[in-house]
């Protein structure tokens, strides 16, 4: 991940058969039945399946559309992160399906809010290499030590290089307590 300024310690790597199985495994490991997993909608529909099929509740924080692009309603996001039953957030970065690359400031604010309410971020960053070259992709974990310590980042070559049959993914978990 040298090209995206994310320093990955080999000890922080865990491997999986894919990003979706990894997300499901993390949901099972880091939450309990009936807890809530937050997603910013619209979002990749499989996230809902991964949450519900593991006995957790989906909590939606709708993105707001200003006529040109989608953005985060930080007031809504914070109110939902403040719910004590919200223990995980799935962050799609870049966002699927809207294609939005989140700014460093937006990612930092998400990280600070999640730290404030002790919510772990599952960062699905499988589309990191399929972006507009004019817009910088910023890995969530690279934004700050706070973001790095509360995140589980899921990556795979399968989308970018059309290798779906390979069934592989890497999960980056810097915090040994989450690993």
Task: Enumerate the language-model features and the residues they cover.
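Residue-level marker for buried hydrophobic side chains located in beta-strands
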Residues: 93, 121-122
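Hydrophobic "anchor" residues on beta-strands that sit immediately upstream
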Residues: 88, 120-121, 152
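Substrate-gripping "pore-loop 1 plus following alpha2 helix"
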Residues: 134-138, 148-151
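Metal-dependent active-site segment of extracytoplasmic phospho-/sulfohydrolases and closely related
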Residues: 118-120, 131
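Walker B catalytic acidic pair
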Residues: 125
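Conserved core of the PLP fold type I
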Residues: 1-112, 129-130, 137-142
